[in-house]
Design a protein with these regions (language model features):
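Catalytic loop of short-chain dehydrogenase/reductase
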Residues: 146-170, 175-184, 193-215, 247
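Canonical Rossmann dinucleotide-binding motif of NAD(H)/NADP(H)-dependent dehydrogenases/reductases
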Residues: 10-43
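C-terminal helical subdomain
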Residues: 191, 212-303
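A short, exposed helix-loop element centered on a Lys and neighboring polar residues
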Residues: 132-133, 176
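The beta1-alpha1 cofactor-binding region of Rossmann-like NAD(H)/NADP(H)-dependent oxidoreductases
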Residues: 49-50, 70-81, 114
Length: 304
């Protein structure tokens, strides 16, 4: 007789304090609710007091612990204040889940205004930098921290949203930089590329696409991956993880040997041997600038 397998050990966050930015609605709200349900003490940050307080109240009503915070991540002083809220309410900080952001499609690069660029970059990219920087001394001092940045597949290229793609691509670089900096001091940093039916998705002009998104991509299905990436036991740092509709997968950056002519390289070599430049033969995952530099320094007698 085959014995029934034991139920998997639940993932818990007891004793951990988490900041979730942009947590009043959409993806951030779902992340905050799941963290709260699994034992974390949650700072629910959102510039809308109504929505921040509602999410915090829902966590508390379900038996969890949460407080609302309404400071803007785009303001460095606001980021400092968010961290102070965590320390004041719960006396500690372990998790920084950066989710806040404003703006999306703006049209072509010619149609995108300075004001739109500023709004998008200041929240998605600079806001994530501000809050993580404010929290970093605490995480460093305790030799433990979990940081998540909310990037997007749009960073790989998307029509009609050059500023958004730029900001999200910046988060790729920030994730990798934080992973390198945090490795010796117990801090991990990863990026989530979520696909969920949120307010911005509801603005899609194509009705068929909109309905498909609404049916298959509820925001809460992005939260298991988001929360695992800020758990004590997360096995990675510097990764880009896409999730949506129940799928979770790695998005990798790779480097290839390419064309290497040494000092003899000419413009004509690049033209005539372009197939070697872009060949995927010998490809390997590149996680940092040092990994990419290793293609040049593989035979060096000094350490890169």
């Amino acid at each position: 007789v085959t014995e029934p397998s034991a139920a998997p050990r639940p993932v818990r966050f007891d004793g951990r304090v988490a900041i979730v930015t942009g947590a009043g609605r959409g993806l951030g709200r779902e992340h905050a609710l799941l963290l709260g349900a699994r034992g974390a003490q949650v700072v629910v940050n959102d510039v809308s007091a109504t929505h921040a307080e509602a999410t915090a109240a829902d966590i508390v009503a379900a038996g969890g612990q949460a407080v609302a915070d309404t400071h803007s991540v785009a303001d460095p002083d606001g980021a400092d204040a968010i961290v102070r809220t965590a320390l004041g309410a719960f006396g500690a900080l372990h998790i920084v889940l950066n989710n806040a952001g404003q703006g999306g499609p703006t049209g072509t690069i010619e149609q995108t205004t300075d004001a739109q660029v500023q709004m998008i970059v200041s929240t998605h990219l600079i806001g994530s930098f501000n809050v993580t920087r404010a929290a970093w001394p605490i995480l460093r001092e305790q030799s433990f921290g979990r940081v998540l940045l909310t990037a997007s597949g749009s960073a790989l290229g998307a029509a009609g949203m050059p500023a958004y793609s730029m900001a999200k691509a910046g988060l790729y670089g920030l994730t990798r930089a934080l992973a390198v900096e945090g490795a010796p001091i117990g801090i991990t940093a990863n990026a989530l590329l979520p696909i969920g039916y949120t307010r911005s998705a509801a603005l899609n002009p194509h009705e068929d696409t909109r309905r498909w998104m609404e049916e298959h991509f509820p925001p809460h299905l992005c939260s298991p991956a988001a929360c695992w990436l800020v758990h004590d036991d997360v096995p990675c740092s510097g990764e880009l993880i896409t999730t949506g509709a129940g799928r979770v997968a790695r998005v990798a950056t790779v480097g290839v040997p390419g064309l290497d002519r040494g000092p003899a390289l000419t413009l004509e070599d690049v033209r005539d041997r372009w197939s070697d430049v872009v060949s995927m033969e010998g490809a390997r995952v590149v996680m940092s600038g040092r990994d990419e530099l290793a293609f040049y320094t593989g035979e060096a007698t000094w350490r890169a």
